[in-house]
Design a protein with these regions (language model features):
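Non-catalytic accessory segments flanking enzymatic or RNA/DNA-binding domains
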Residues: 1-101
Length: 101
């Protein structure tokens, strides 16, 4: 599964796409060190799918140095929030929505 994490820190919009075999366990580990971030969406996906998401994030955002997170514009953040993983894979079903701000 690939998943979309989102975090809004003041005026900074942070997003991360990762991959995990056990989504609930991965989300629980995030709550420990980043309790304000939400796991917005997930869908079936491979290492290749995760890489494709990272490539798209490189085009629309700026990677935080030494981090798995990207800073994106308000417009991109809103689109990611609305579409979830569908932002990256518009024809891929099912897209699961997990948490909301």
């Amino acid at each position: 599964m690939v998943y979309l994490m989102m975090d809004k820190r003041g005026s900074m919009n942070l997003v991360k796409v990762g991959r995990a075999s056990h989504i609930p366990q991965r989300r629980a580990s995030y709550r420990t060190h980043n309790p304000l971030a939400i796991m917005r969406s997930n869908c079936a996906g491979t290492v290749k799918a995760e890489k494709e998401c990272h490539e798209k994030l490189n085009k629309v955002g700026k990677r935080v140095p030494r981090s798995e997170w990207w800073i994106v514009s308000d417009e991109v953040f809103a689109s990611l929030y609305e579409k979830g993983m569908g932002y990256f894979f518009p024809n891929h079903l099912p897209i699961h929505f997990c948490e909301e701000f």
